[in-house]
């Protein structure tokens, strides 16, 4: 192939289509199988660069991945086979950085966590499917600082035995719900 050549590779029902520049992948690269997209990748000088997408076997989007110089950079999003957002996470220089959020199939938040240079750092929150807080914990340098506080589906804290505190005690310390 010569400089800037487009190419198409076929093996059985799989097909790879892209472009080379000075013997390195450059520009969009498309992978298909059985006529359905498997991935749309973006290259610059042989490195992943730009927005790449992967697809589920049913053709729906599986992930959107922003790359810079072969490393994840920005918000990556991951989807179910039905198309619902399952997780979004921010990356910097290929490492998790900032907030990562995981979702239940109905779209409500299941978990929020914070990262610093790829290590869990700060507040971790997990939620019940009804949206109420299930767990609140703190991390420092990837280490859990304490067992955290767990909560029942109605919002009451759980005691050390895993039982919800009495409503009277909960209301007394937190104020009655209206």
Regions found by a protein language model. Give the residues of each.
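Periodic aromatic/glycine/histidine/acidic cluster detector
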Residues: 1-80, 84-103, 108-116, 120-126, ...
